Amino acid sequence: MVSAQSDGLRKLGRLLAVLVLALGICGCRRAPAVRPVTTQVVVLGFDGADPNLFSKWAKQGKLPNLARLAQTGSFRPLGTTNPPESPVAWASFATGLNPGGTGIFDFLRRDPETYLPELALVSREKAKFLFGLIPIKPPRVINERSGVPFYKAVADAGYKTTVIRMPLEFPPTPIPGGKLWAGLGVPDLRGTWGTFFYFGTELTPWDVGDTEFGGKLVRLEMNGNEASSVVEGPVDPTADSYRRISVPIQFKVAPEGNAVTIQLGGRTETLAEKNWSDWFRVKFRINPFLSVRAICRFYVLEVSPDLRLYMSPLNLDPESPPLPIAYPANYTAELVEKHGLMKTLGWWHDTWALNEEKIDEGLFLEDSFRTMQAQAEITLDELKNDPPSLLVSVFLATDHVSHVFFRLLDPEHPRYDAELAAKYGDAILQSYERMDRIVGDVERAMKPGGTLIIVSDHGFHTWRKGFNTNTWLVQNGYMTLKQPGVEDKAYSLEHLFGQGSFFPNVDWSRTKAYALGLGQIYLNLRGREKFGTLEPGPEADQLMEEVRQKLEAFQDPDTHQAVVQKVYLGREIFHGPRMPEAPDIQVDFRDGYRTSWQTALGAIPSGIIVANMKKWSGDHCSSDPSDTQGIFLSNRPVATQDPSILDVAPTVIAILGVHPPGHLDGKVLEFKPPAAIK
């Protein structure tokens, strides 16, 4: 009987392997390009590049390639979306639609049935298993961005297209005859935006657990010169209750105390202090027939007297990703064959580990610039060795470096440090200088007569203080608590990605409005929210106007200066088929202020204004678009004086002579005719 069962399991395993292989083969098919490459357009995105910083450093001669483009071609501040958040703006960049058309209004959205936040970029359907063993329904991930990306329209028209690290392309859009590698939005294997691990012997039992934003702190207890622990990976899809699948990890300190040996996933590597490991491949077994793989690497922060190690997030293995991250499916495997193993996580630079002060500024910059250079090499290789008619490549380093180093440009920031500023005050400039070199290299690699367009999705501001919007709503009578005076516990991203509860102290029967995300307020509408109290129509309209007036009049009690620049009603700034999902109110703050982290996650701390004591010190997410513009440069002069990020899609389509894929909100920018490619 046992033998028969074993034989049956082996046959089932072989059948599943054949099915997986068949799915892989189907995903790897690539239709041939139709048109020869006679016209070339290259679009480079540099997330968060600010027009004021660009202009300042270009005038100082520090950005020679970009300055030359501005003089011989064109430079304009680029209008952005409201709110000027990366996913919102890149969705409009790709489709030429405003957020009411794309359906992307923030990183987060709320479920009106539960009031719980969830990621706005994708929706997920869980896998189903028979007896917890046999997958009878695969997991499904749905890209929530509506609209047809311009690179999809171009590829459909027969133009060879290559897209590298494009935000909001998870899962990726099929690009007939072309290639696409998804960027911002791709999760780690844990299903988060990048959970780093920190292993340390100095941690107390009270230190361990989840950090506010994206970290796992693990205490090591030495047994002689050895320590054992686990790496927690993905949620077990076969379990009835919430639990994560783990794999063991071992550390062994050398007798001399100058190195540590790491054993993980069947691989062993010995590292001295202040050194990076190579990539580790880690397999998490779901059941006897199914496992998923990730890659990660370590940095040894200290060996003695305390053992302290940083471990990168669990990136989906680019050679066998459990979820689609590229089109065709084997594109990232081809890149690995050419360029070696690389990160696949959408949030490419580990801002969270620096923000939680588990790595330092130097280590963050080393890793970020190495990652930026890897993307530059891939971009140049595609241009030189497999040139397409359209290439799009979006870099994130300019944004991520700005987020965590803006404090060193702002002596008034609570985390300004003169000593650190002397050492790392040029960190943001360094990211711009690398941007400049990439632009020069790309321009030289392009076909003669091609069109080069450089864009950023938004600019930047210092962020000195956070605004607890839900606390303001409580104090102004728009939200009622079950237990007034009882402060919420601090929330973390694990609550969002895990099994946390939100708004546990809110009395929905007496609440009129609630805040979630980075600047959004929702009315507790009857007929829409599960426990709605507010009647749609005049009652709701009156409340929104009242909230607008009070927020715009609110002053910082320390400075007596206005905090909010402008409050918009959703119906004033959004239009399109996804309007039912839009926030009712969008709050845009003045320079120096932003929605607090805890408001973004749905918490209700005690005070309204809180000092920003984090290294994440620059932001844009709930700023006003009028003073948070991005940049637009091109090697061709442009006549249009007020370009918008919505204009890029129709402009590229027009240059290549492609019919627009339906209505677009953006306009075609007026260029001089491109020179013919010889």
PLM regions with names:
Residues V2-L16:
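Bacterial N-terminal signal peptides that target proteins for export
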Residues G24-G27:
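C-terminal motif of bacterial Sec signal peptides marking the signal peptidase cleavage site
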